A protein has these predicted regions:
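Bacterial N-terminal signal peptides that target proteins for export
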Residues: 1-9
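C-terminal segment of classical bacterial N-terminal signal peptides
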Residues: 16-22
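Extended terminal accessory/targeting regions
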Residues: 22-205
């Protein structure tokens, strides 16, 4: 995706959604705290959170994002952008939470990716879409180990963008035909990533 197209997508998405309340929820998946109010940062490519915003997961753990946080959706793999741009639709609120905790690495990559799924479901993202996005993040999203400093570079995926797109399509087919639970989805992602296209990364495991 070109930077121009990415910019246009972000412009349309924020213009349409800024200030929308996050008070909806399927309580089984937690709930949001505050409102999503955002604007573009000075570089025209990042989104700046204007008001504090947060999410409480099903276990009661709070995932807060402070006002002033800048995000560009980078924690959502680029292979998903054509299908699910990270700042459009109901999953926008979950993408901000996920970006922030991928940046600061306060919690494990496993918990951070799992909260992306639960936060999407709490925002009424349909089950299949949430599973496809979670599976792709599990495959290609950032990973880190204990003690990794905020901002420290993550290992790059070992698949090209074209290979990632191919794997996302296969993941989509698996979710739509098998309706896996999350444990089965993670196991399937591991099998995919241990194949000839992309050996499973060992970083942060």
């Amino acid at each position: 995706m070109t930077m121009t197209l990415r910019y246009l997508l972000l412009t349309a998405m924020i213009s349409a959604g800024a200030g929308v309340s996050a008070s909806w929820a399927d309580s089984r998946f937690g709930h949001y705290v505050g409102k999503f109010v955002a604007e573009f940062g000075g570089d025209g490519r990042k989104v700046k959170l204007i008001e504090p915003y947060g999410y409480v997961d099903p276990a009661g753990e709070q995932w807060d994002v402070p006002a002033g946080y800048l995000t560009d959706g980078a924690s959502v793999p680029s292979a998903l952008w054509a299908l699910y741009p990270p700042f459009t639709g109901a999953y926008r609120s979950a993408a901000v939470i996920h970006d922030y905790y991928c940046d600061n690495k306060q919690r494990s990559w496993q918990d951070t990716h799992k909260v992306f799924y639960n936060a999407m479901r709490a925002a009424d993202v349909d089950e299949n879409t949430a599973k496809i996005m979670y599976g792709a993040v599990y495959l290609f999203g950032p990973r880190w180990g204990p003690g990794t400093a905020p901002g420290q570079r993550n290992a790059a995926p070992k698949a090209t963008p074209e290979q990632q797109e191919e794997m996302v399509e296969k993941l989509k087919t698996f979710v739509e035909t098998e309706n896996p639970d999350l444990d089965s989805l993670e196991a399937h992602a591991k099998r995919m990533s241990s194949g000839p296209i992309m050996p499973l990364r060992k970083d942060g495991e």
